[in-house]
């Protein structure tokens, strides 16, 4: 395991609870003020022993409530689009589109979680975590036991910009997202949150 991943794994287990309220305030401000958002991301999936399973990268954007576009560029091309009612998963290599209702996916993807409305305090138990470097950490534990993730951690800069996101699922796999080139409240055109399946692909729906 690399030194970076070792430090990351240690932080997952040992980050102490802090008395500060800055991360919660940053989250509330982000939810209430970031009506649109855009960023590039790198994503690392780790198994329960914190060994790297896969890495990916791409770009993402959202418009509250419930509209988002999540694009994987590497190592494969995949597109996830939420149009406010449905979520479209397009795997270009498989030539396959899967469609789900938005309310069925709100807790199952990072994109849907970030693009949700201002109900986070209703849906999650929030707990402060100590500052690491220049990043203020917050832990959110879903109140709904059927959520795809058991634990979510959000890292904000001291100016309140989202920097990192960590999600642990029921198999103790960890998804680690690092955001860069972030823009809060950019102008996003409606067509970015619309999707029409390409001709000839298989479409699987609920």
Curated annotation (Swiss-Prot):
<keyword id="KW-0574">Periplasm</keyword>
<dbReference type="GO" id="GO:0042597">
    <property type="term" value="C:periplasmic space"/>
</dbReference>
<dbReference type="Pfam" id="PF03548">
    <property type="entry name" value="LolA"/>
</dbReference>
<protein>
    <recommendedName>
        <fullName>Outer-membrane lipoprotein carrier protein</fullName>
    </recommendedName>
</protein>
<dbReference type="GO" id="GO:0044874">
    <property type="term" value="P:lipoprotein localization to outer membrane"/>
</dbReference>
<feature type="signal peptide">
    <location>
        <begin position="1"/>
        <end position="23"/>
    </location>
</feature>
<keyword id="KW-0653">Protein transport</keyword>
<comment type="subunit">
    <text>Monomer.</text>
</comment>
<dbReference type="InterPro" id="IPR018323">
    <property type="entry name" value="OM_lipoprot_carrier_LolA_Pbac"/>
</dbReference>
<dbReference type="GO" id="GO:0042953">
    <property type="term" value="P:lipoprotein transport"/>
</dbReference>
<keyword id="KW-0143">Chaperone</keyword>
<keyword id="KW-0732">Signal</keyword>
<keyword id="KW-0813">Transport</keyword>
<comment type="function">
    <text>Participates in the translocation of lipoproteins from the inner membrane to the outer membrane. Only forms a complex with a lipoprotein if the residue after the N-terminal Cys is not an aspartate (The Asp acts as a targeting signal to indicate that the lipoprotein should stay in the inner membrane).</text>
</comment>
<dbReference type="InterPro" id="IPR029046">
    <property type="entry name" value="LolA/LolB/LppX"/>
</dbReference>
<comment type="similarity">
    <text>Belongs to the LolA family.</text>
</comment>
<dbReference type="InterPro" id="IPR004564">
    <property type="entry name" value="OM_lipoprot_carrier_LolA-like"/>
</dbReference>
């Amino acid at each position: 395991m690399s030194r970076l991943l070792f430090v990351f794994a240690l932080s997952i287990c040992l980050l102490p609870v802090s008395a500060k309220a800055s991360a919660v305030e940053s989250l509330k401000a982000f939810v209430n003020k970031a009506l649109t958002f855009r960023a590039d991301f790198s994503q690392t999936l780790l198994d329960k022993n914190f060994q790297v399973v896969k890495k990916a990268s791409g770009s993402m954007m959202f418009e509250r409530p419930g509209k988002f576009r999540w694009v994987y560029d590497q190592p494969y091309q995949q597109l996830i689009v939420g149009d406010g009612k449905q979520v479209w998963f397009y795997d270009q290599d498989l030539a396959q589109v899967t469609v789900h209702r938005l309310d069925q996916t709100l807790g199952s993807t990072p994109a849907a979680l970030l693009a949700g409305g201002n109900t986070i305090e209703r849906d999650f138990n929030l707990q402060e975590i100590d500052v690491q470097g220049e990043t203020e950490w917050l832990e959110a534990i879903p109140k709904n036991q059927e959520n795809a993730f058991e634990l979510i951690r959000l890292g904000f800069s001291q100016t309140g910009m989202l920097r990192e996101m960590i999600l642990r699922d029921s198999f103790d796999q960890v998804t680690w997202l690092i955001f860069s080139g972030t823009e809060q409240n950019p102008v996003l055109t409606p067509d970015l949150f619309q999707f029409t399946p390409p001709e000839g692909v298989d479409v699987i729906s609920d």
